[in-house]
Amino acid sequence: MHQPDYRDSSGIIQMPWVFLHAIKDYYDMPWMMARHDGLKATFNITAPLIQQLKLYYNAPEESDKFLALWLKNPSLLEEEDRKWVIKLCKSTQFDTMVKPFERYSELYYEEHLNNLELIDLEVLFILSWCGEYLRRDNEVIKALIDKKRDYSYDDKSLLLEELSRFVSGIFSYYAKLHNSGVITISTTPLNHPILPLLMDMQNAIKANINTAIPKDYIKLEDDALLQVTRAKDLFHDTFGFEAEGFWPAEGAVDEKSVELLKSCGIKWIATDEEILFKSLNSKDRKNLYTQYNYNDLCIGFRDHYLSDLIGFTYRHQDSGSASRHFMGELEKIQQENPDASLFVILDGENAWEFFQNNGFDFFNALYSDLSSCSWCKTMRMDEITKLPREDLLSLAPGSWINGSFNTWVGHSEKTRAWELLFLTKRDCKHHHSELDEDTKSKIQDHFLAAECSDWFWWYGDDHFTEFGAEFDELFRMHLIDIYDLIGITAPADLFVPIIKDRSAGNFWLKPQSDISPVINGKHDSFFKWIGCGVVDESKLFSTMDRQRGPIQKINYGQDNEKIYFAFKGKIKEMCSASSIIIIIDPINVKGKLSFETKKTFLGNLEVDTACGDWFEIAVDKNKIDKDEISIRFELEKDGNIIQILPGFGELKIDLSRDYSQNWFV
């Protein structure tokens, strides 16, 4: 469970994600598991999340910019504030969170809202973020959901008051489950930094030799130590006991950072399977199914495939079927490795908004199956440390994203952010002797906050958010505030945005006109796909990441007769897959297509395919009696889903083909 520090120099939280995930995920995740007998798990809670969540205990509107504006009467909002509130209220996943509320769906696409409509939008936005526990057990939330529309200012006040009371009990609930032996709680270095990069930027090159790192970088080993010790202190102050385990931010490790953790009393950590495979110079998965001892520290290595099944693949599937599939995958491993330890490690908050009912149905099915299973039991990480371990002689540097650090360093924007951080460090050092202890302490706080991995995550073109400008400003403001504390003028470069102007158009271009390409698998004409829509899979990852599949770009479009698709990417790897599954709703078509040139019938739906320079599909429209359809694809290899397309969920196609909204004049 993690959120970066969204506070500005005045201490006001600039983005509402801590509060929103608190009412949706932070209580729900342990609660859903604790409903089932005999299950155990480990929950990781980061320091910035702890610090900010505590600010919502009393009068949350005084600590959160969004909630302060949200609570206002809409008639009192300045125009820019009004636009920002509406933007946030429309930032929710439509199919799983907006669509279940009829009134929310009505308002979602309205461009102009009167004051009463805005109150409805605001209330329904917060209600859509309420998790299953609140929807089932809280009378205030249930009554407001039942009201459906025509909310009042008093409803807003009541809602915020009730949710403030609710979030104030979250950490005590974790402590209760910990004390009863149901869960173990771990934490992460203070501001979620990539410790190996703080220790030595050369780790980025060791993990991937092609990585460009900043020139004249500084080793920030003292900061790395503070990130660890301060996290431990805050954890103890919050929960009343010592943190014995750490999830290094983003599973990022190297030998020196792990030695640092051990020296601070940490007994176990977890990271990704890619680190193990690189450390052993072997990809034999049997090596994954145990715990390891490295320098007297216990390490569990995350099973990427099993974890991604839950985090990504199952979101579109029937809950019972998904649970049975997962148990089947566990059983395959158990039959070959009866004493195997499996480490399933997940993003605790960002996946569930893509599931129906915030993942409740899926987890209820899975936890029921696990609770009644005789050959598999769940364990806490502190229990794992008591089991026999395999010795690991060396530890390769890397993270849980492709075993490298390229998500946080390498791109020109990421490099620029690091350079500004190092510049500020050098300027601060020149004036350090002139500063009193209180000022030094405040400056150190800003440096530790600026080292958060999240800022670097959003720089570059590998992840997208509509709030990139806000993240960029928060990062630079930490450095500007340092110059203000020193008493000197901040460099002009700090007032220039690092992040380039980006929008969803960078990864998703909608069709501009009809197309009628010949389906032959060949890149034989520049004009073949002119006017098509494009989904760039390489650029659409957001708050979560996974191993990226072979398909990197999708072209799509239609004419009077057919809907066309072209899949580009690593064609050999793509065609080595067993099949591509096509799912079309609401006409309930689902079928497998092979990577060859042929005609296939899915029921009465005729589908042409061709494989060559890329893979192409044409779907006959004549049997589709709908104005709009939703299509997604699943790339299957050896019975496993290795990629879901498009990565943002499903492609909605308007069969009426009104392109006017996509034209630029």
Spans of features found by a protein language model:
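Catalytic domains of cell-wall/extracellular-matrix polysaccharide-remodeling enzymes
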Residues: D222-K283, N350-L370
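Short, well-ordered beta-strand segments enriched in hydrophobic/aromatic residues
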Residues: T188, G521, K562-K570, W614-D620
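CE4/NodB-like, metal-dependent polysaccharide N-deacetylase domain
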Residues: I209-P248, G328-I345
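Short, solvent-exposed turn/loop segments enriched in Gly/Ser/Thr/Pro and often Arg
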Residues: N44-L49, P189-H192, G245-V253, D382-T385
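Acidic/polar low-complexity flexible segments
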Residues: L509-D514, I583-K598, N622-V665
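Active-site and substrate-binding clefts of carbohydrate-active enzymes
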Residues: M1-D146, L280-S513
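Acidic (Asp/Glu)-rich catalytic clusters
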Residues: A34-H36, S172-T187, K262, N293, ...
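Structured, charged N-terminal subsegments at the starts of enzyme catalytic cores
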Residues: E161-H192, M201-Q202
